Amino acid sequence: MSIQVEHPAGGYKKLFETVEELSSPLTAHVTGRIPLWLTGSLLRCGPGLFEVGSEPFYHLFDGQALLHKFDFKEGHVTYHRRFIRTDAYVRAMTEKRIVITEFGTCAFPDPCKNIFSRFFSYFRGVEVTDNALVNVYPVGEDYYACTETNFITKINPETLETIKQVDLCNYVSVNGATAHPHIENDGTVYNIGNCFGKNFSIAYNIVKIPPLQADKEDPISKSEIVVQFPCSDRFKPSYVHSFGLTPNYIVFVETPVKINLFKFLSSWSLWGANYMDCFESNETMGVWLHIADKKRKKYLNNKYRTSPFNLFHHINTYEDNGFLIVDLCCWKGFEFVYNYLYLANLRENWEEVKKNARKAPQPEVRRYVLPLNIDKADTGKNLVTLPNTTATAILCSDETIWLEPEVLFSGPRQAFEFPQINYQKYCGKPYTYAYGLGLNHFVPDRLCKLNVKTKETWVWQEPDSYPSEPIFVSHPDALEEDDGVVLSVVVSPGAGQKPAYLLILNAKDLSEVARAEVEINIPVTFHGLFKKS
């Protein structure tokens, strides 16, 4: 998996080009044979509009949200896409300029207003974006597109029409929520977001949304906070993108990438700033791992620590004989990886892309093992007694537990990211296989499968082809964990190729089963799901 491929033609730049939405679905040209059991829709979110008029967006997470759908029926495939009608998008289209500040792009007051109107507009408070470009997930019978703020957007998964905006603050105490909730098999949704806790200090709340009940009321209206995690810094919450969940425990990893709330509230309101301006790194903090008892709704005061890293995606978490196994896609060090995801960097020529990536934190897939039963008499000892891991947990004299990981995969500037597993059957349980998007100096150029027990890897890769996050779909009669297919949207700007296609791989060995080609470009997508018919 560590074989490095070069991209001198710069075809990856097509990932960051504005496209138009479609008025109706396109029929894709299929080569190979799509399994007849594969019936349903692949839904994906990402940016599709990278500028408004003459005003560009600057960061990868700024472009306006585009919702994509590949429909599978009786071996045929259609492709559809529509922009999500968020407030950010509608107002930008109406005023023909960027109206709401995005992750790395500031919105400025209407230049047509006089100086007094512009001055007072800064004191209206922080106007938070609802640009739902990151993920889509189910709540009850409904589907929501989301970013990482308090706003989520209800969409119609059949027509891709936007239905309404929902403010989570109207139901629970969170300032925002991640785009990676956990969905249990009964439909229960868990998520995490920071909040103001006791004495106005910052904390992190776990939100639970129940499954749809017999009364058919919106489950979001029945949301509740089930447990609260403390924050290591009273006024500077860590950036959190995902978390771990097992049948009995919740795992939260607190990294040194911090949000400076004073800067967020003051500079944003007074003279204009964006989200990226408000991040800073605590160079001395390292990483703290927190756990809570899910069933008893209780925070457990075990103090797990380790050396600094960035974290965006948990792979899986499970229980094993008194231990929690936590598998993560890490980036070494305390510097924020998002500093390297400005569009200007990603659109550079290949040699410059590599040069920039060499300065960034380096990726590594790691396994941490957290002992649940701590005996103070074991100070100085390794508490990990499992026979199948090299990870350690040393009980220190200050009663903290210092963790060292087992490395599952590591390659220089070769990341295994956007991980997926056989989620429905193995989330929170012992598992063997993970699927990931391979990033080559931040350029997505391969799909990977990792055996987390043996560290064996499989790779799909073709020249001038730029895939997306792999989505695993289990065979309806599966007998083994990896019985099924992997779906990925591939951008293919090379000569003699269609601009983009939906790739279907055998999940066993990543051999190609089929592809469904379309005659139009598809920009980068981040996350999504397969909705079975």
From Swiss-Prot:
Outcome of swapping residue 408 to P: In LCA2; severely decreased retinol isomerase activity
Effect of residue 510 to M: Does not affect isomerohydrolase activity
PTM info: Palmitoylation by LRAT regulates ligand binding specificity; the palmitoylated form (membrane form) specifically binds all-trans-retinyl-palmitate, while the soluble unpalmitoylated form binds all-trans-retinol (vitamin A).
Cofactor: Fe(2+)
Main location (coarse class): cytoplasm
Any one annotated GO CC term: nucleus
Reactions performed catalytically: an all-trans-retinyl ester + H2O = 11-cis-retinol + a fatty acid + H(+); lutein = (3R,3'S)-zeaxanthin; all-trans-retinyl hexadecanoate + H2O = 11-cis-retinol + hexadecanoate + H(+)
EC number of the protein: 3.1.1.64, 5.3.3.22
Recorded consequence of changing residue 313 to A: Decreasing protein levels. Loss of enzymatic activity. Significantly decreased protein stability
PTM annotation (N-acetylserine): residues: 2
Residue positions binding Fe cation: 180, 241, 313, 527
Impact noted for substituting residue 170 to K: Increased isomerohydrolase activity
GO terms classed as biological process: circadian rhythm; detection of light stimulus involved in visual perception; neural retina development; retina homeostasis; retinal metabolic process; retinoid metabolic process; visual perception; vitamin A metabolic process
Subcellular location: Cytoplasm; Cell membrane; Microsome membrane
Residues anchoring lipid (S-palmitoyl cysteine): 112, 231, 329-330
Effect of residue 162 to P: In LCA2; uncertain significance
Impact when changing residue 70 to V: In LCA2 and RP20
Keyword field: Acetylation, Cell membrane, Cytoplasm, Disease variant, Endoplasmic reticulum, Hydrolase, Iron, Isomerase, Leber congenital amaurosis, Lipid metabolism, Lipoprotein, Membrane, Metal-binding, Microsome, Palmitate, Phosphoprotein, Retinitis pigmentosa, Sensory transduction, Vision
Modified residues (Phosphoserine): 117
Keyword Transcription: no
Membrane topology term: Lipid-anchor
Positions bearing Phosphothreonine: 101, 105
Purpose of the protein: Critical isomerohydrolase in the retinoid cycle involved in regeneration of 11-cis-retinal, the chromophore of rod and cone opsins. Catalyzes the cleavage and isomerization of all-trans-retinyl fatty acid esters to 11-cis-retinol which is further oxidized by 11-cis retinol dehydrogenase to 11-cis-retinal for use as visual chromophore. Essential for the production of 11-cis retinal for both rod and cone photoreceptors. Also capable of catalyzing the isomerization of lutein to meso-zeaxanthin an eye-specific carotenoid.
Record note on quaternary structure: Interacts with MYO7A; this mediates light-dependent intracellular transport of RPE65.
Protein name: Retinoid isomerohydrolase
Species of origin: Homo sapiens
